[in-house]
Amino acid sequence: MANNDPAAKQYAEWTGRACRADGIRYEIRTIDDPIHVELALQQANDDPKVHGIIVYYPIFGQDKESYSGTSQDDYIRDTVSFQCDVEGLCHLYRSNLYRNVRYLDPPHNHIKCILPCTALSVVKLLEACPNVYHSQAIMATNRQQASPVGLSLKNDTHVTIINRSEIVGRPLAAMLANDGATVYSIDLHSIYKFVNGTLQTCTETVEECVLKVRNSFLMHYYYIVRTDAVLILTKRIAA
């Protein structure tokens, strides 16, 4: 913990409560000066008594807008060893997520990659919604097998995600794009578009991204709202 953000402190308290309920030893290490966070993480990575690390963000915040991310917080995420990263935010896990790789040890496939929990929970909620995912794709997901890019969601699924944080918006966009949705990733300064997992130039406005509706179709809307992200999924069904 290297900030005074009330939401981060509350999240840390909830994390501790959940860990204690499951019999997991939980310790908060407070860093007074953010400049010492990297050293503290390196020490935790090397500590044999530490099996998992959670960093409570924001620490430095975003420097400038870039889809790849350019903030010091991004650097801090990559300082956490993948062997201790329980949030799936380090470079290795992010890279595997964007390439739709589910295991750390292919082709043996014994060690599963860790996915960001909030983004994954949204996907699981959508799997439970009718007429969104192919049933065989859900079965493959439950077995931790990655379906081919673009073949999990049913045709003509459009998703608009208002938020592009490294914790929620960005990984969620990648997951749903890999599953076959046309995804519009909206942040304060830009809009990105994914088609079948491929990043493309977006010419639509925010309003057009949210209102991707054709008059000849009946739309089902699923709204999943958090304080830091809004996902709007539209599923086109013939009238």
Describe the residue ranges of each PLM region.
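Glycine-rich loop at the start of a catalytic domain that most often binds anionic cofactors/ligands
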Residues: 11-16, 41-44, 67, 74-76
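Short beta-strand elements in bilobed, periplasmic/extracellular small-molecule ligand-binding domains
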Residues: 16-32, 183-186
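Short, well-structured alpha-helical segments in soluble
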Residues: 36-48
